[in-house]
Curated annotation (Swiss-Prot):
InterPro entries the record matches: Cyt_c/ubiquinol_Oxase_su3 (IPR024791), Cyt_c_oxase_su3_dom (IPR033945), Cyt_c_oxidase-like_su3 (IPR000298), Cyt_c_oxidase_su3-like_sf (IPR035973), Cyt_c_oxidase_su3_a-hlx (IPR013833)
Main location: mitochondrion
GO MF term set: cytochrome-c oxidase activity
Species this protein is from: Spodoptera frugiperda (Fall armyworm)
Subunit-level organization: Component of the cytochrome c oxidase (complex IV, CIV), a multisubunit enzyme composed of a catalytic core of 3 subunits and several supernumerary subunits. The complex exists as a monomer or a dimer and forms supercomplexes (SCs) in the inner mitochondrial membrane with ubiquinol-cytochrome c oxidoreductase (cytochrome b-c1 complex, complex III, CIII).
Name recorded for this polypeptide: Cytochrome c oxidase subunit 3
Transmembrane segments annotated in the record for this chain: 13-33, 48-68, 83-103, 125-145
Location of this chain's protein in the cell: Mitochondrion inner membrane
Length: 147
């Protein structure tokens, strides 16, 4: 039986769905920033990157809120262990990706990137997309199927 009968899982259509929308939106905004830098549109690059960073921070805050409000702990069952380890490991990668993108924003504001020279940002954007895709699998397997 998954989750165990003693566990009350989160409603997948509340904070988990909001977090899914936030990460998908951040994937759109980082893509917007990437297209902007390729077109030498510095103001849109700044806007897209700033929005992505804010969305990453917002996701992290909501995830922390969810942890504090969880009706179960990491020690309650295999479900609690799986939930906190999988979402925590993902959350750590979101924080790392947000820091990567923040460094890219600082570098962009210091004119370290151009339309032909922006691999650091491109690598961070690919990393961010990977984190997005991983979240979709976590959302389906932990929140949706686990409900």
């Amino acid at each position: 039986m998954w989750p165990p009968t003693s566990i009350t899982p989160f409603n997948p259509f509340q904070i988990p769905l909001l977090n899914t929308i936030i990460l998908i939106s951040s994937g759109v905004s980082v893509t917007w920033a990437h297209h902007a830098i390729m077109e030498n549109n510095n103001s849109q690059m700044t806007q897209g990157l700033f929005i992505t960073i804010i969305l990453g921070i917002y996701f992290t805050i909501l995830q922390a809120y969810e942890y504090f409000e969880a009706p179960f702990t990491i020690a309650d069952s295999i479900y609690g262990s799986t939930f906190f380890m999988a979402t925590g490991f993902h959350g750590l990668h979101v924080i790392i990706g947000t820091l990567f993108l923040l460094i890219c924003l600082i570098r962009h504001l210091n004119n370290h990137f151009s339309s032909n020279h922006h691999f650091g940002f491109e690598a961070a954007a690919w990393y961010w997309h990977f984190v997005d895709v991983v979240w979709l699998f976590l959302y389906i397997s932990i929140y949706w199927w686990g409900n």
